[in-house]
Amino acid sequence: LLIFLAISTLYLFIDKFYFQESPYQGDGTPNNSILWEHFFNNGMQNSIVIGDFLIFHEFDEALGRVRRIQDYKINTEDEFESYIQTNPKRNITEFPLGELPHNSLFNIVDLHKVFLAYKHKFRISFSSEIDIDYIKGRNVIYVGEFKNLRAFSDLIATLPFHYQTLPDWEGLISFTQDDSLITLRAHHDWRVSRYVEDLGIIAKLPGQNNENYLLIIGFGYNSQIKLIDMLCDKVSLQELETQIMTVNNGNMPDYFFSVFKVLGFDRASTTAKMEFFQKVDANFFQNYTQSPY
């Protein structure tokens, strides 16, 4: 709840002192990029969706009181219902608000600079409160873990990769490249150091009715912080676009999917290496066998 209030306060501050009164020019912020321009020239509302964690209340007989719990293994409605069914005597109820990951504060600060540069506003929503109909008629930027995708898992269902979440913010990503199956693992060993090898994806996808979707997803905080920072800084975004054009016949596509390995110490990663890239066609949803529309 405190984090929710913090982000709400942050957005009100941004709206009042930056959107309405600030002379900010965004010199270090992308303001002439194919990646971002589509979000500001189609006349649709922009929504930033944060992948939040499910919270529930449970009565603890030993303590004699109700506890508020966030369990990393109980994060979807199906997982929650299964937990209730297997523990009928624990008096379990879902809390109406989710817990926001700490990285979301960094992400909002970075993203708002882009919106300031384009002089556009955005709305903040949470993955726990929306369904797939939410993507209709609006642009969406999702930032969160694979674990917190919920309805947005439909958006990446036909992308050319597979992912598996593992305990402790680890996971696997597999894709085919040059006729070979490649599997990468997000890993950290905090018994040795705070060094993290995280994995994440950036997917910019077209909607069926001129919407635009940008999904920045990782297994841990590191990938989300680093990839958002990379997209919101003019120099690093230009470097990424140059790298993409190098592997895409000199062109920067409107839509694409990419996998990144992110390296560095906990919440302070310094390196993002693109491991896989593929252009996404403008008729992406025509290939979707169970269309969300």
Descriptions of predicted regions:
Residues L2-D15:
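Hydrophobic membrane-insertion alpha-helices, especially the h-region
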Residues Q20-Y293:
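Solvent-exposed alpha-helical segments and adjacent loops
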